[in-house]
Amino acid sequence: MSNSNFSIEEHFPDMWDAIMHDWLADSSSANPDPDLPVISPKQRSLLRKVTPVGLMGRIVVLETPNKWTKESIEKDLIDPIKHVLKTRLDLSVSLAITSTNGESENRAEAADDSHTRVDAVGDTHEGASQKGSVATADDLSMSQVEELVNKAEQRDGASQAGVSSAAETAEEAARRREHDADELAGQYSATENHIDPNPSPTPTRWTNKETAHRPAPRHTSPHTPSPQPSSSFNDGLDGESLLNKNYTFENFVVGSSNNFAAAACRAVAEAPAKAYNPLFIWGESGLGKTHLLHAIGHYAKELQPNMRVKYVSSEELTNDFINSIANDTRESFKRRYRNLDMLIVDDIQFLQNKESTQEEFFHTFNALHQANKQIVLSSDRPPRQLTTLEDRLRTRFEGGLITDVQTPDLETRIAILTKKAESDNVQLPEDVKVLIASRYEKSIRELDGALIRVTAYCALSHEPLTVETAEIALRDISPADQDVEIVPQHVIEVVANYFNLTTDELVGKGRAKKFVQARQIAMYLCRELTDLSLPKLGSAFGGRDHTTVMYAERRVRESLSENKKVFDQVQELTQKIKSHARD
């Protein structure tokens, strides 16, 4: 999938799988996301039986194994599903729910219910009862439903199985989808298989929270990395601004390597368009630039609640612009970006070689700047080195304040580990902090990965967290190997061989469990062992979207602390990859 040709309709089943995985896991966690509807165990069981058939226009077609499941979902889950899709994908949809428990049964029912039952009320009738919101509609013909079903069968390689294959029950399909949702991502949460030792009370019936006051954001769970904020349907995002709630000034560790940048960011948040405009932050990957960008947006909105703030990656900006051309909505695109009080664009360097997007961004930049609105940008290099961007863009970037973030010193690295351990409720001895901080100097991401390995190893082996156990956990990712240059092809070749796959199978479109699990591990190892950005890694894996890599990384990180087999595989593969890179 190339970013420029991204299609929600084409990839909707994978989006559904990823979103449902996170919603189900979140609903059973002790600290559920306030933006996601809390659903009961019975409702979670119903959702696991749903198969996404496809998206046609604004109609989502879902498939259930029998009439009872279909009616139960129509009764209790229509509004929650619509709310989640609106929150995560910014889609206002209707639902067409079909039952596939025998064609004869459905055709017999057709005499009494001649049309597919569709939730056709839409956003203007949110106050209606759920039962009343499911009505007959001609929005989707039976031939269209069959067309989507056929596409779903082809996508899953199930042309011989049919829609209601006896070879794969609904429960098996749910488990398969849980493993196969690798194309597009939600965001970080505990895995469904994790059993909470202190389960939360039975959840109350869901009510719409769009206008309710939002509680304070929660911390990320133990062994779970800070969320990457690139996806437009990520867990922990704040409404239309797309600000990640976990990235604030309060949990940003300030040291000599980033002191000036942090101070500049606070100044911009306190006085938008009056202090430094534009503000341009640059530095290598993994040093906290994205964290600072989100923190600016949060603090600015805290001081001025009505402020219109939008965070976007350059890749999302490009996709949004291309979609506006394809859908003939250029004017809508302009309004969305030019009516803001603050526009924050991450990884601006990825606008390189995208001439049309550069042209549009140039005019957007001018419109905002002339209207005295704040612009914040980040890159992996200073403006003068962005030689692939147009001169007129570079000169505008240089017209404000340029600041950088550098590799953190030892004291700052220890402070970062301390804060991460506290947020994860991990008792990390001082000597272990010093060991990790002394060994991993390159980036904050390295520190995070090392901490996760140590805590996962101790949890799985039931060992105390000591310097000795930390040494064992980290022996396969020793910085002594940092002189070895590892590229994605090294990882792909080793992982493919390890799992008895070809490299084409590993990076291809196959969604069988053996392909997906190996692919996710390979993506995780690429993220850990290389310095490439998410979009670059997505390109290395068959041109996938960067959110696919994020999702894979999150899934493997979760498994590391819960599944010793995965932990051992990652350890062994790390050594094999480094040996392969040396050869």
Curated annotation (Swiss-Prot):
Q: Which GO terms describe its molecular function?
A: ATP binding; ATP hydrolysis activity; DNA replication origin binding; lipid binding
Q: Where is this region: Domain I, interacts with DnaA modulators?
A: 1-91
**Positions annotated to bind ATP:** G286, G288, K289, T290
Task: Output the Pfam families linked to this UniProt entry.
Answer: Bac_DnaA (PF00308), Bac_DnaA_C (PF08299)
Q: Major place of localization? A: cytoplasm
Keywords of the record: ATP-binding, Cytoplasm, DNA replication, DNA-binding, Lipid-binding, Nucleotide-binding
Domain IV, binds dsDNA: region residues:
459-583
- Would the keyword tRNA processing be found if you checked this record's keyword annotation? no
Which GO BP terms, alphabetically?
DNA replication initiation; regulation of DNA replication
Keyword ATP-binding in annotation? yes
Q: Where is the composition biased (Basic and acidic residues)?
A: 172-182
Record region (Disordered): 151-239
Record's subcellular location: Cytoplasm
InterPro entries documented for this protein: AAA+_ATPase, Chromosome_initiator_DnaA, Chromosome_initiator_DnaA-like, Chromosome_initiator_DnaA_CS, DnaA_C, DnaA_dom, P-loop_NTPase, Trp_repressor/repl_initiator
Q: What cellular component GO annotations does this protein have? A: cytoplasm; plasma membrane
* Superkingdom classification of source: Bacteria
Region annotated Domain II sits at: 91-241
Q: Which family does it belong to?
A: Belongs to the DnaA family.
Self-association or partners: how does it assemble?
Answer: Oligomerizes as a right-handed, spiral filament on DNA at oriC.
Q: Give the protein's biological function.
A: Plays an essential role in the initiation and regulation of chromosomal replication. ATP-DnaA binds to the origin of replication (oriC) to initiate formation of the DNA replication initiation complex once per cell cycle. Binds the DnaA box (a 9 base pair repeat at the origin) and separates the double-stranded (ds)DNA. Forms a right-handed helical filament on oriC DNA; dsDNA binds to the exterior of the filament while single-stranded (ss)DNA is stabiized in the filament's interior.
Comment on protein domains: Domain I is involved in oligomerization and binding regulators, domain II is flexibile and of varying length in different bacteria, domain III forms the AAA+ region, while domain IV binds dsDNA.
Q: What is the designated name of this protein?
A: Chromosomal replication initiator protein DnaA
Q: Which organism is it from?
A: Corynebacterium jeikeium (strain K411)
